[in-house]
Amino acid sequence: MFQPNTIVKVGNIVFSNETPFSLIVGPCQMESRDHAFEMAGRIKTITDQIGIGFVYKSSYDKANRTSLGAARGIGLEKAMAIFSDIKKEFGCPVLTDVHTEEQCAAVGSVVDVLQIPAFLCRQTDLLVAAAKTGRVINIKKGQFLAPWDMENVLKKVTQSGNPHVMLCERGTSFGYNRLISDMRSLPILRSFGAPVIFDATHSVQEPGGQGDSSGGQRQFVEVLARAAVSVGVAGIFLETHQDPDNAPSDGPNMVKIDHLQRLLETLMEFDYLSKKVN
């Protein structure tokens, strides 16, 4: 049986609970090649200036949208070509979600990190198929799970022969259309040995809160992210966009890219103090 790696390397980016945090960042949905390149380019400029490593993220298919008519993305085939070009152009690793076992091999042939969505985190066949790609696996904790329940989820991947796993906290259901972030979950998740990621933007989501779409409270992203890095995490997950209010999905949660650098600089200061004390 494999134990999870306490240090996970994605290209030249290191995720460890004991070292300065790294970043998973990008728009919620892949909208077009031009938009993906614009976002990746701006993110690279910002992260180069402040000295933090990043993995570029985006979703080719938002398979769990609130309503049938909601925009879902550009699809797997187009997205893989764009991800491949982003890796070459900007020299950054990339991450995207998988929703079925059949998608794992195709996505794993291009993408560096396969992400298991929160709603699917207990789907054994999906976890095993993702594990067998040999890629790094980032598992979102289901909103319906206690943090200690994630140990068995983690073992499904490691016992399939893949120790390259990260666990991601993204909030817990707290009544209807509400999530709450319990920071006690972070040390609990850390105790399983894998790097822990905090998803600061989905944690402020209001699932289905706008009737036919999800709402959110982006004004609390920084509050929760500060708390998470103060506890100590391996990485911060942030979705960003140049115009969140007009984004095709998760706009109410996303950080405007014009505000990204200041936010990251603040988080890096909190992270430094946290890791120095610990």
Swiss-Prot record:
From the Swiss-Prot or TrEMBL record, state where the protein is found: Cytoplasm
Q: Does the keyword Zinc apply?
A: no
Which keywords does the record carry? Cytoplasm, Lipopolysaccharide biosynthesis, Transferase
Which GO MF terms are attached to this record? 3-deoxy-8-phosphooctulonate synthase activity
Provide the primary localization.
Answer: cytoplasm
Q: Which Pfam families match?
A: DAHP_synth_1 (PF00793)
User: Per the record's keyword annotation, is Transferase included, yes or no?
Assistant: yes
* GO annotations of cellular component type: cytoplasm
Report the SUPFAM superfamilies cross-referenced here: Aldolase (SSF51569)
Put simply, this protein is called 2-dehydro-3-deoxyphosphooctonate aldolase
What is the source species?
Bartonella quintana (strain Toulouse) (Rochalimaea quintana)
Q: What is the lineage of its organism?
A: Bacteria, Pseudomonadati, Pseudomonadota, Alphaproteobacteria, Hyphomicrobiales
Q: State the gene name recorded for this protein.
A: kdsA
